Regions:
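Acidic, serine/threonine- and proline-rich low-complexity regulatory tracts
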Residues: 101-167
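Ankyrin-repeat interhelical turn detector
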Residues: 90-93, 127
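BTB/POZ (also called T1 in voltage-gated K+ channels) oligomerization domain detector
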Residues: 1-74
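Fungal eukaryote-biased detector of long internal structured cores
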Residues: 77-90, 100
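Alpha-helical oligomerization/assembly modules used to build nucleoprotein complexes
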Residues: 43-46, 77-80, 109-117
Length: 167
C-alpha cells in the first residue's frame, strides 16, 4: 500500500520501480533528506521518469523517509525486506532510513542471530562499524574461514574483529 506523500499530484520528479510502479516526489524534499539525488534546481525533462532497480515495496518504505513526517515503523518487516530497504538507503543515501535500518539491524536480536553472516556482509560492505562491533561477540565461535569474505572487504574491521576474539 503506497503512502499518499509519495504519490503527490504536484510532484516534480517521477521514479519508477522495477515492477513498474510510479512514485511522484518533490525534488526539494529529496535534496534535503538524501545525498544520492540531484539538487532541486537541477533541470529535468518534463514528464521524465527515472527508473530504479528496487521493487515498489522497497521504494514505498524508503521514500517515506524523504518527507517531513513521522517515519514508517520497520518493526513488522522481515529480515529480507529490511535488508532491501537498508541497501536502498545506502545506495541513495536516504539519511533517515540509514539510521533506522542500521538501528534495526543492530538491535533486533533475532536478525543478529539468525542472519549474522548476512548482517556482517552488509556491515562490511557499507562500513557500518557499530554493526560489526555488535556481531563480534555473537559470532565468536564462527570460524574465520566462514566470514573472511565479509571481513576482507574492510581490513580495519578484520583487525578489530580478531582483537575482540582475543579478549
Amino acid at each position: 500500500m503506497q503512502n499518499n506523500k509519495v504519490q503527490s499530484s504536484d510532484a516534480d520528479v517521477t521514479f519508477q520501480s522495477s515492477d513498474n510502479v510510479d512514485f511522484r516526489l518533490h525534488k526539494r524534499y529529496l535534496e534535503f533528506a538524501t545525498g544520492g539525488f540531484p539538487p532541486a534546481n537541477t533541470p529535468s525533462s518534463l514528464g521524465e521518469i527515472v527508473r530504479l532497480s528496487e521493487s515498489s515495496t522497497t521504494l514505498d518504505i524508503l521514500f517515506q523517509f524523504v518527507y517531513p513526517q513521522r517515519h514508517p515503523s520497520l518493526d513488522k518487516l522481515g529480515f529480507e525486506e529490511l535488508l532491501k530497504v537498508a541497501e536502498a538507503a545506502e545506495k541513495y543515501e536516504v539519511f533517515g532510513a540509514l539510521t533506522a535500518t542500521h538501528l534495526m539491524l543492530r538491535c533486533v536480536s533475532k536478525f543478529l542471530h539468525s542472519h549474522s553472516k548476512q548482517v556482517l556482509q552488509f556491515a562490511c560492505v557499507h562500513r557500518v562499524a557499530p554493526l560489526v562491533e555488535r556481531l563480534a561477540p555473537i559470532m565468536m565461535d564462527t570460524p574465520l574461514s566462514k566470514i573472511k569474505s565479509a571481513l576482507i572487504l574492510c581490513p580495519s574491521y578484520f583487525v578489530e574483529w580478531v582483537s575482540t576474539l582475543d579478549h
